[in-house]
């Protein structure tokens, strides 16, 4: 696939590139209630996540999530709605200025994965990631995010991701990427380019002082219907 360019935002850091964390990414289960273009003023703290007007709405389309002004209180679709069996198997972030890889996550091959007792499996396992970066991460200008994913035996038309980033429930930036068409039973690789506008010193200071209050929702659509929803939160303090 071609490299796709995003619409700006706050985000990913490394001589190592300033901002790269020595732990980089820590996959976890989602905390119960933890509570990118940049804002030029310090946001007012908002209330914690809560159920919104989209909860229970079906189907959910791109215009629905583009209207959201806070992090969602829960996932807007179930794992079972991923009928296309889209599976992200590798994720890499690099600083576009230096080319340095900041971190990389890769799923082991199916043959090497441990057997799972499905009765004990968290249905939302794998849908939440916690990121840990150093303060310099907030000053990067451009980052490339490479994703590698497989699809099942159905063709995937008009595959699209909308990713919305918030600090204390104030929208910082919305990214909109189009993957296009994916043939059945294929493995696909695509790099999205995130352009990050400058953040005010006041906002950077607040985001560093309040780890994990920067959060994001990633919505994935096929033919304008929501089929996957992932969440993440972020620390820029450089410590777990």
Swiss-Prot record:
Q: Which residues carry this modification: Phosphoserine?
A: 37, 39, 41
Q: Where in the cell is it found?
A: Cytoplasm, Cytoskeleton, Microtubule organizing center, Centrosome; Cytoplasm, Cytoskeleton, Spindle; Cytoplasm, Cytoskeleton, Spindle pole
Q: Where is this region: Disordered?
A: 1-62
Question: How does this chain assemble?
Answer: Interacts with CABP4; in the absence of calcium. May interact with GTP-bound ARL1. Interacts with ARL2 and ARL3 (GTP-bound forms); this promotes the release of myristoylated cargo proteins. Found in a complex with ARL3, RP2 and UNC119; RP2 induces hydrolysis of GTP ARL3 in the complex, leading to the release of UNC119. Interacts with NPHP3 (when myristoylated). Interacts with CYS1 (when myristoylated). Interacts with MACIR; interaction only takes place when UNC119 is not liganded with myristoylated proteins. Interacts with ARL1 and ARL3 GTP-bound forms. Interacts with ARL2.
Keyword Phosphoprotein belongs to the record = yes
Residues binding tetradecanoate are 131
Per the record, the GO terms for biological process are: endocytosis; lipoprotein transport; mitotic cytokinesis; negative regulation of caveolin-mediated endocytosis; negative regulation of clathrin-dependent endocytosis; nervous system development; visual perception
Gene behind this protein: Unc119
Mind telling me how this protein is modified after translation?
Answer: Phosphorylation suppresses its interaction with KLHL18 and down-regulates its KLHL18-mediated degradation. Phosphorylated more under light conditions than dark conditions. Dephosphorylated by calcineurin.
Looking up Gene3D superfamilies in the UniProt record yields:
GMP phosphodiesterase, delta subunit
Q: Which family does it belong to?
A: Belongs to the PDE6D/unc-119 family.
> Where is this chain primarily localised?
cytoplasm
Q: What does this protein do?
A: Involved in synaptic functions in photoreceptor cells, the signal transduction in immune cells as a Src family kinase activator, endosome recycling, the uptake of bacteria and endocytosis, protein trafficking in sensory neurons and as lipid-binding chaperone with specificity for a diverse subset of myristoylated proteins. Specifically binds the myristoyl moiety of a subset of N-terminally myristoylated proteins and is required for their localization. Binds myristoylated GNAT1 and is required for G-protein localization and trafficking in sensory neurons.
- In its UniProt entry, what is this protein called? Protein unc-119 homolog A
Show the domain comment.
Adopts an immunoglobulin-like beta-sandwich fold forming a hydrophobic cavity that captures N-terminally myristoylated target peptides. Phe residues within the hydrophobic beta sandwich are required for myristate binding.
């Amino acid at each position: 696939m071609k490299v796709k360019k995003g619409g700006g935002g706050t985000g990913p850091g490394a001589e190592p590139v300033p901002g790269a964390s020595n732990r980089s990414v820590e996959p976890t289960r989602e905390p119960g209630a933890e509570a990118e273009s940049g804002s030029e003023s310090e946001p007012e703290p908002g209330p914690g996540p809560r159920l919104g007007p989209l909860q229970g709405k079906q189907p959910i389309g791109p215009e629905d999530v583009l209207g959201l002004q806070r992090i969602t209180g829960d996932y807007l679709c179930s794992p079972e709605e991923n009928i296309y069996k889209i599976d992200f198997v590798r994720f890499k972030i690099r600083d576009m200025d230096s080319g340095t890889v900041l971190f990389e996550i890769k799923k082991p091959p199916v043959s090497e994965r441990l057997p799972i007792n499905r009765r004990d499996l968290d249905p939302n396992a794998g849908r939440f990631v916690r990121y840990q970066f150093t303060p310099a991460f907030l000053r990067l200008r451009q980052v490339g995010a490479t994703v590698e994913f497989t699809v099942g035996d159905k063709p995937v038309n008009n595959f699209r991701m909308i990713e919305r980033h918030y600090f204390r429930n104030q929208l910082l930036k919305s990214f909109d990427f189009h993957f296009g068409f994916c043939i059945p039973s294929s493995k696909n690789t695509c790099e999205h380019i995130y352009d990050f506008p400058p953040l005010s010193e006041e906002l950077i200071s607040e985001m560093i002082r309040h780890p994990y209050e920067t959060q994001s929702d990633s919505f994935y659509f096929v033919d304008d219907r929501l089929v996957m929803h992932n969440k993440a939160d972020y620390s820029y303090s450089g410590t777990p």
